[in-house]
Swiss-Prot record:
InterPro entries the UniProt entry points to: Class_I_gatase-like, CobQ/CobB/MinD/ParA_Nub-bd_dom, CobQ_GATase1, CobQ_N, CobQ_synth, GATase_3, P-loop_NTPase
Name of encoding gene: cobQ
Designated name of the protein: Cobyric acid synthase
Domain GATase cobBQ-type residues, every copy: 251-448
Signal peptide span: none
Amino acid sequence: MTLAVMLQGTASDVGKSVLVAGLCRIFHQDGLRTAPFKSQNMALNSGITPDGKEMGRAQIFQAEAAGIAPDVRMNPILLKPTSDRQAQVVLMGQVATSMDAVSYHQYKPRLREQILAVYQSLAGEYEALVLEGAGSPAEINLRDRDIVNMGMAEMAQCPVILVADIDRGGVFAAIYGTLALLQPQERARVKGVIINKFRGDVALLRSGIEQIEALTGVPVLGVMPWLDVDLEDEDGVALQAGKYHRTDRRDIDIAVVHLPHIANFTDFNALAAQPDVRVRYVRDPQALADADLVILPGSKNTLGDLCWLRESGMAHAVEQARQRKVPLLGICGGYQMLGETIIDEVESGLGAQPGLGVLKTVTHFAQHKTTTQVQATLGSALPDWLADAAGLRVSGYEIHMGETRREAGCPPLLQLHKAGQAVDDGAISDDGLAFGTYLHGLFDSDAFTRALLNGLRQRKGLAPLDSALEYARYKTRQFDRLAEAMREHIAIDKIYAIMRQHQEPLC
């Protein structure tokens, strides 16, 4: 029978996703066929499986840690917020509908059978499953319809390990309060606690650990230190918390506009990993003053974020950067915003709205959502400073609802290779300093990223760097470093014992 364990947290952003990835890596290293699973994920960072299904980025990088290809069954429900009260509901990788929070809460019980069937199908193929909860299991107002925390643990009949974040303070209160709010049968599933993100001497915690174990009867399985491991973040919490607000100087300064509905900011992880690059996420228009490249990222609410650009003064700051000859790149929603016109007769019903007018393009929103992995080739119309990128092969994925057409004389940035045909994508401005594309994951292609950065270095009078960072190997090293640290600081043997002791047939 399949071994299974579920990590739940005392709150959001306590580090569940990273620790799940670490366990997946450890079990993979130990020779077990392992897969991650999260029944419901709310995030704007998503990716595409090899068969064109959309799922959360967290489960994609967890699958990578487990040494397997991502499978939409690992994240059957994805909620993508489009506003403070509305979210797009993606079921098994395809858009199903949009709902407000109250309607979705009423709808959730209908999903239980599908979730269980998907989980059972994974359990039939893998030797170990590592489940992840969402937020906290102690949200007592949501308990009756829970499908992602204790409700999922009950369906899977698996033990739970509670993760608590000491960096935010009040860790023992968070552990005690969470366990106190659980029902007796729920609390009985919690077989251990991991204290995460500790800075300092663990000896200072010993008396507290002894007391919390005595108070709750639940053992603390380990104390994970704060790790400088570069792994993907699930949502915008990391941006708000300042993880990417670097202050050290690098040769190349890249400013990513932090849109209110920013999506797929994982696009820029490979950029941030480069030795000569500082990536900043900015909302202050003045923060564009020193940028060597400005990026408008993806958005889950293109027109809403376009309005914010104008109201915040960021659109004016982008135009000032253009006047200073600073290169500008738009990806997906950012690409749409850079065009002349956006026509929306689907979502908002606003009709034709003016874009920023940087690229000679017109975007029509559509009901159909394009979700596909693609290979592409950089076009030949690149400016001199980017000439080394011409003809390079890149890979990535598309996630967008809409079609963008170039006006006559506006060259494409890329040629996508789809079903044996070459399809133009993206656009280049007349001055060769502004670009747009629908392709996410572009910077994961090492040769292109180094060509772009060396072009920016050339514009600053800096010598090029010869070697390109091999981002795939870089990520593998991060997974291995995480696994090594978890083996050192967490009683992995006890986790194995918990999983084996509570191995039960699925209901």
